[in-house]
Amino acid sequence: MKSCAILAALGCLAGSVLGHGQVQNFTINGQYNQGFILDYYYQKQNTGHFPNVAGWYAEDLDLGFISPDQYTTPDIVCHKNAAPGAISATAAAGSNIVFQWGPGVWPHPYGPIVTYVVECSGSCTTVNKNNLRWVKIQEAGINYNTQVWAQQDLINQGNKWTVKIPSSLRPGNYVFRHELLAAHGASSANGMQNYPQCVNIAVTGSGTKALPAGTPATQLYKPTDPGILFNPYTTITSYTIPGPALWQG
């Protein structure tokens, strides 16, 4: 058991050195909710279990990314070998979700940030990720005047990003898919880096709108999309944020 603990520590260290980040936690109107963190993977390996959290299980052991050549694989849904979170957080429609990335400072100032949502027909804790159809509710790209990307804004905000749950969204069980697309290598084929992170949230309130038909995660992006393969190191006057159209609610 002692050797397992040592291996776990080494694994966590390797992740912090080689990797980039994941959603460590998220708050809703100030209420803290734990995300799935790398420590939990090693807890599962050593003990067979880990804490019940709303963040989805994923095996991004290097805190790394999904590359464009993996866009048609299940890993693009909610990261590598992802599985639903064991519980759901609760939030009223119209609430703000603040996603906290970590464990260190996000290293990439180039690239957009997007967030999707899907309603589960039952509990999101047992949903089949391959059957989910995603609707985009938030997107941010580049400020053409300042040439500052959304990910630089995230860094300036202490690795935090705020997403508003549409006020009109009807009550139900939802999975929110929050994603950074790091574009520092986007000028080369297969150079974009996607960091999808998923959390379960039970939405309450008086909203009445159902989500429109969504898009399977494996169809959200193509490696040659103009917002995926482009030169981020030139003055940008037009940029198409990857993914389907934004739902206005």
UniProtKB/Swiss-Prot annotation:
As to how many cofactors bind and how, the note says: Binds 1 copper ion per subunit.
Compartments it resides in:
Secreted
Q: Which cofactor does it need?
A: Cu(2+)
**Its Enzyme Commission number?**
1.14.99.56
Segment forming the signal sequence: 1-19
Which InterPro entries would you find in this protein's record?
AA9 (IPR049892), AA9_LPMO (IPR005103)
Listed as disulfide-bonded, the cysteine pairs are 78-198, 120-124
Residue numbers binding Cu(2+): 20, 108, 195
> What GO biological process terms does the UniProt entry carry, in alphabetical order?
cellulose catabolic process
Q: Where does O2 bind?
A: 184, 193
Q: Which GO terms describe its molecular function?
A: cellulase activity; metal ion binding; monooxygenase activity
A GO CC annotation given for this chain: extracellular region
| Inducers of expression | By cellulose, lactose and sophorose.
Which reaction is this enzyme known to catalyze?
Answer: [(1->4)-beta-D-glucosyl]n+m + reduced acceptor + O2 = 4-dehydro-beta-D-glucosyl-[(1->4)-beta-D-glucosyl]n-1 + [(1->4)-beta-D-glucosyl]m + acceptor + H2O
Query: Which residues are tagged as glycosylated in the record?
Result: 25
Q: Which domain of life is it from?
A: Eukaryota
Q: Which UniProt keywords apply?
A: Calcium, Carbohydrate metabolism, Cellulose degradation, Disulfide bond, Glycoprotein, Metal-binding, Monooxygenase, Oxidoreductase, Polysaccharide degradation, Secreted, Signal
Query: What is the protein's applied use?
Result: Lignocellulose is the most abundant polymeric composite on Earth and is a recalcitrant but promising renewable substrate for industrial biotechnology applications. Together with cellobiose dehydrogenases (CDHs) an enzymatic system capable of oxidative cellulose cleavage is formed, which increases the efficiency of cellulases and put LPMOs at focus of biofuel research.
* Quaternary structure, from the entry: Monomer.
Function summary: Lytic polysaccharide monooxygenase (LPMO) that depolymerizes crystalline and amorphous polysaccharides via the oxidation of scissile alpha- or beta-(1-4)-glycosidic bonds, yielding C1 or C4 oxidation products. Catalysis by LPMOs requires the reduction of the active-site copper from Cu(II) to Cu(I) by a reducing agent and H(2)O(2) or O(2) as a cosubstrate.
Family recorded in the similarity comment? Belongs to the polysaccharide monooxygenase AA9 family.
Protein name in UniProt: AA9 family lytic polysaccharide monooxygenase cel61B
What does the record give as the organism's lineage? Eukaryota, Fungi, Dikarya, Ascomycota, Pezizomycotina
